C-alpha cells in the first residue's frame, strides 16, 4: 500500500475548518484565500479517497470519517508544535506560549505595571488568565492548572513538587465604609461575629469564613469565625460590595490604597490587627521548564521586585534575598 504524503498545511486547514464549521471563517483565521482553503481540502479528500466534511447543510459538518480522523490530526499538530517549541527552546529562541495565572487583582496589576516592561519577548505569546482561589485553598493549597506555566498566589501549592518563590508579604485586615461603621461600630476582631462580613469563597468552612489576625503588638495569631449575606470568589468584587456599605471586607492593604485616600473605605480597627500573607510565584522546577518560561518568569519577577523595592513595600534585606 502506498503511503500517503500528508502535508502540514492540509491538516491545519482541516483542524481550523472543523473548529469554525465555515470555510470563509477558516480562510480569515489562516490568512489565506478562501479558494485556496477549498482547494487544499479537496486535494486532501481526493488523496485519501474519503470525505472529511458533509457539504449538504448550510454549515460544514464532519462526516463519520472526519469525526474519527480529527483527534489524530489535532494530536499530530500538537506534536509538531511541541517539536518546534523544543527546537526553539534549545536554541534559546523567543517563541511559543507562556501562560500566567493569578487572582483578578494581581492580573490587573501585571497588566498595568509589569507586562509592558518586558520589552523583548520576540515571538512569545503571553497568555494572562484569571485564577481566583478555590474553596479551602488557603488551608489545603492551591491547584496548579494543567496549562499553567506560572501561578502567582497568596496560597502555597498543593503539589509539593512545585517551586514557590517568595515575592513579598501583604498585610490583610478588615475595612468598611464610613457609613457602615457609623451604623455598626466595631473596635476589635472578636466583635466581627456580630457584623455582616463579606465572605471570600476560598476561605469558606461550612457557611462561614475564618479570618486571622495578629494580636496587636505581638506575633500571636488568632482565628475568628465570621458570617454574612454575600460571598465572592475574588477580592475585587468583595471590595465593591464594601464600597456600597454592605459589610466588612477582609482585604490586602495594597488593594485599598485609593479607597483609603479618598475615604471610600476605612480600617475597622485603630490598633494594627492584621494577617500577613506571603505572595508567591509558583512554577515547575527549572530543569522541567522550557527556556521561554524561564525567560518570562525571570523578567517578570525582576520587574515586580524592582517596583516593590522602589516603593519600599519590600524591606531591603528581603529584596536582596529574593534576587539570590
Curated annotation (Swiss-Prot):
The lineage's top-level taxon is Bacteria
Binding region for DNA: 23-42
Ranges of residues in domain HTH lysR-type: 6-63
One annotated GO molecular function: sequence-specific DNA binding
Q: One cellular component GO annotation, for this chain's record? A: cytosol
Q: Which Gene3D superfamilies match?
A: 3.40.190.290, Winged helix-like DNA-binding domain superfamily/Winged helix DNA-binding domain
Q: Give a GO biological-process term.
A: regulation of DNA-templated transcription
PANTHER family per record: HTH-TYPE TRANSCRIPTIONAL REGULATOR YBHD (PTHR30419), LYSR FAMILY TRANSCRIPTIONAL REGULATOR (PTHR30419:SF14)
Protein family (similarity comment): Belongs to the LysR transcriptional regulatory family.
Q: Which protein is depicted?
A: Uncharacterized HTH-type transcriptional regulator YiaU
Show the taxonomic lineage: Bacteria, Pseudomonadati, Pseudomonadota, Gammaproteobacteria, Enterobacterales
Amino acid at each position: 500500500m502506498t503511503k500517503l504524503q500528508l502535508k502540514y498545511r492540509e491538516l491545519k486547514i482541516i483542524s481550523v475548518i472543523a473548529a469554525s464549521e465555515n470555510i470563509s471563517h477558516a480562510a480569515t483565521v489562516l490568512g489565506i484565500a478562501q479558494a485556496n482553503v477549498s482547494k487544499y481540502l479537496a486535494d486532501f479528500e481526493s488523496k485519501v479517497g474519503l470525505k472529511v466534511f458533509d457539504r449538504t447543510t448550510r454549515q460544514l459538518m464532519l462526516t463519520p470519517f472526519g469525526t474519527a480522523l480529527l483527534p489524530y490530526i489535532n494530536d499530530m499538530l500538537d506534536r509538531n508544535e511541541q517539536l518546534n517549541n523544543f527546537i526553539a527552546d534549545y536554541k534559546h529562541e523567543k517563541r511559543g506560549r507562556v501562560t500566567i495565572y493569578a487572582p483578578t487583582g494581581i492580573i490587573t496589576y501585571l497588566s498595568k505595571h509589569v507586562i509592558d516592561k518586558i520589552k523583548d519577548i520576540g515571538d512569545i505569546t503571553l497568555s494572562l488568565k484569571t485564577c481566583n482561589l478555590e474553596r479551602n485553598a488557603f488551608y489545603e493549597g492551591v491547584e496548579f492548572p494543567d496549562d499553567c506555566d506560572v501561578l502567582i498566589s497568596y496560597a502555597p501549592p498543593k503539589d509539593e513538587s512545585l517551586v514557590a518563590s517568595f515575592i513579598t508579604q501583604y498585610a490583610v485586615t478588615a475595612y468598611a465604609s464610613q457609613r457602615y461603621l457609623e451604623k455598626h461600630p466595631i473596635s476589635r476582631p472578636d466583635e466581627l461575629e456580630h457584623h455582616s462580613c463579606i465572605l471570600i469563597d476560598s476561605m469558606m468552612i461550612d457557611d462561614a469564613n475564618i479570618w486571622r489576625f495578629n494580636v496587636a503588638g505581638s506575633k500571636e495569631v488568632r482565628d475568628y469565625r465570621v458570617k454574612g449575606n454575600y460571598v465572592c470568589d475574588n477580592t475585587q468584587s468583595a471590595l465593591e460590595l464594601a464600597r456600597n456599605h454592605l459589610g466588612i471586607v477582609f482585604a490586602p492593604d495594597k488593594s485599598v490604597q485609593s479607597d483609603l485616600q479618598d475615604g471610600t473605605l476605612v480600617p475597622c480597627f485603630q490598633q494594627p490587627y492584621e494577617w500577613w500573607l506571603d505572595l508567591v510565584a509558583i512554577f515547575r522546577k527549572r530543569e522541567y521548564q522550557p527556556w521561554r518560561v524561564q525567560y518570562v518568569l525571570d523578567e517578570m519577577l525582576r520587574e515586580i521586585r524592582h517596583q516593590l523595592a522602589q516603593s519600599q513595600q519590600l524591606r531591603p534585606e528581603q529584596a536582596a534575598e529574593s534576587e539570590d
